[in-house]
Amino acid sequence: MYVHHLFLRDFRNYRRLDLALAPATTLFYGPNAAGKTSLLEAIFYLATTRSPRLSSDRELVRWDAVGEAGTPPFARIAADVERRIGPVRLEVLVQRRADDDGQPLNGAQKLVRIDKRPARAIDLIGQLRVVLFTPTDLTLVDGPPAERRRYLDITLSQLDPHYVRTLAHYQKILLQRNSLLRAWREQRRVPRHVDAELAYWDQELAAAGGYLLAERLRAIVELNDLAGPLYQEMSGGEDRLQIEYAASCDLGTARDAGGLAERLLLAFAAQRSDELARGQTLCGPHRDDLIFTVAGINLGRYGSRGQQRSIALALKIGEAGLMRRRSGEAPVLLLDDVLSELDAQRRAHLLALIHHPDQQTLLTATDLSDFSADFLAAVRRYRVEDGQVFAG
């Protein structure tokens, strides 16, 4: 799998870009704020429908972009992707919102096309699989639980169309259930009506949550197999890394979706009074976490910076291995100025992944001196300056 062509219009600081890409390694270099990261962001967005940097799509549209025929400005991101199952054209238009008088509103709207046919944003996910490495990956280890849930969800959503749809369904049900719990707490609903409605939402949430849990637990088994030995090598012979799934409720020994759904129903019943008092759902996949241990020590809490960096890198390389193992194709690797952050040993492990046959890697750097002459001779290079890309 690789991106054959990337097209941008009014995206970030790019007015226009039409760039052919090789199926091997491409290095984009140049000063900060030149647009290097935006190239990787565009490809990540096509794969996941979200930016790794922003909460609002509105900011993706170039600040001085002009709309056509009185319409609000928009950004266009498109790519031709070569895959084992056949080529595909992916395209997203992100348009700023405006009122009837043309005055800007908050937010943006998306128009998605797959092979030039209109599609839903959710249908885009999994058409192109990517793994993004950034200097902020350390938050996977020492950041809040939401970062680790997001890591799992992005990985599994790209591999399993049913997972991403179930995740979206779960989030909608969760909003409904929380709204009902708050209504009871604020005495806006009759208690007997709340009980009947909660019974319905409990069943719906448990069914969706059971599937999410089953897939997450299966992925953790595989990630332990892939990332555990990598950490051991990078750390110079420390004990093997163990990734533990820290569920917010007692799952018992259940591992299949049906059994896990039953465990969730039991947990909802046990926590009913607390949930009604607090007005929120207190257990489920939306509150779970990952714990990283070596020799029984929680390295997310007590590990050194070097240990935590090794865990983050092992997780990302493990993510790429999981995608290759399940799909039979290597994902596109996006490395945003990360090699300069790594010591020689960690860099060697990442370069070994880059040099794997059939692996497309797109990486950015500010300084070519971070790379050996042999590496620079083996890759395609582009200089990025002020939203323009030049060969060499």
UniProtKB/Swiss-Prot annotation:
The listed locations are:
Cytoplasm
Which positions in this protein are listed as binding ATP? Answer: 30-37
Please give the Gene Ontology molecular function terms for this protein: ATP binding; ATP hydrolysis activity; single-stranded DNA binding
Where's it mainly located?
Answer: cytoplasm
According to its record, what are the GO cellular component terms? cytoplasm
Family, as annotated: Belongs to the RecF family.
What is the protein name given in its UniProt record?
DNA replication and repair protein RecF
The gene that this protein is the product of is recF
